[in-house]
Amino acid sequence: MNPLRRKRLLIILAILVGVGVAVGLALSALQQNINLFYTPTQIANGEAPQDTRIRAGGMVEAGSLKRSGDSLDVTFVVTDFNKSVTITYRGILPDLFREGQGIVALGKINADGVVVADEVLAKHDEKYMPPEVTKALKESGQSAPTPAKEG
């Protein structure tokens, strides 16, 4: 093999190895950042994995919000109108968080079936509902509650 052909072959191999490594790293990073959405029914039925970060969403049950008096710990119940799941969170809830509205919590399920959230997302206006929550509500035969009109 002449030197020019050998040099070209090495360059092509180096490029292919570099592209392969880049694709592998990108896939690894994407796999670690995927958070699958689970409804309260799926979580209650044991379909959601424990010790894996997931997204859990539904409607916050009225009267279920409990705040700790001496810390930022919050506990509330989320439902899809079939089954409910308890969510615990340590931190400041979003300003738009209210009972009776749709939320999505990101966290892990503990051995007791409670979602220990590290992030809670609330809808940003009364017309928005996360697509996953809307789908889960439709599957359960419910519709999203209509907000009370102000004034």
From Swiss-Prot:
<feature type="topological domain" description="Periplasmic">
    <location>
        <begin position="30"/>
        <end position="151"/>
    </location>
</feature>
<keyword id="KW-0997">Cell inner membrane</keyword>
<keyword id="KW-0201">Cytochrome c-type biogenesis</keyword>
<keyword id="KW-0408">Iron</keyword>
<keyword id="KW-1133">Transmembrane helix</keyword>
<dbReference type="Pfam" id="PF03100">
    <property type="entry name" value="CcmE"/>
</dbReference>
<keyword id="KW-0812">Transmembrane</keyword>
<dbReference type="GO" id="GO:0005886">
    <property type="term" value="C:plasma membrane"/>
</dbReference>
<feature type="transmembrane region" description="Helical; Signal-anchor for type II membrane protein">
    <location>
        <begin position="9"/>
        <end position="29"/>
    </location>
</feature>
<feature type="binding site" description="covalent">
    <location>
        <position position="124"/>
    </location>
    <ligand>
        <name>heme</name>
    </ligand>
</feature>
<dbReference type="InterPro" id="IPR004329">
    <property type="entry name" value="CcmE"/>
</dbReference>
<feature type="topological domain" description="Cytoplasmic">
    <location>
        <begin position="1"/>
        <end position="8"/>
    </location>
</feature>
<comment type="function">
    <text>Heme chaperone required for the biogenesis of c-type cytochromes. Transiently binds heme delivered by CcmC and transfers the heme to apo-cytochromes in a process facilitated by CcmF and CcmH.</text>
</comment>
<dbReference type="GO" id="GO:0046872">
    <property type="term" value="F:metal ion binding"/>
</dbReference>
<protein>
    <recommendedName>
        <fullName>Cytochrome c-type biogenesis protein CcmE</fullName>
    </recommendedName>
</protein>
<keyword id="KW-0479">Metal-binding</keyword>
<comment type="similarity">
    <text>Belongs to the CcmE/CycJ family.</text>
</comment>
<keyword id="KW-0472">Membrane</keyword>
<keyword id="KW-1003">Cell membrane</keyword>
<keyword id="KW-0735">Signal-anchor</keyword>
<dbReference type="GO" id="GO:0017004">
    <property type="term" value="P:cytochrome complex assembly"/>
</dbReference>
<dbReference type="InterPro" id="IPR012340">
    <property type="entry name" value="NA-bd_OB-fold"/>
</dbReference>
<dbReference type="GO" id="GO:0020037">
    <property type="term" value="F:heme binding"/>
</dbReference>
<dbReference type="InterPro" id="IPR036127">
    <property type="entry name" value="CcmE-like_sf"/>
</dbReference>
<feature type="binding site" description="axial binding residue">
    <location>
        <position position="128"/>
    </location>
    <ligand>
        <name>heme</name>
    </ligand>
</feature>
<keyword id="KW-0349">Heme</keyword>
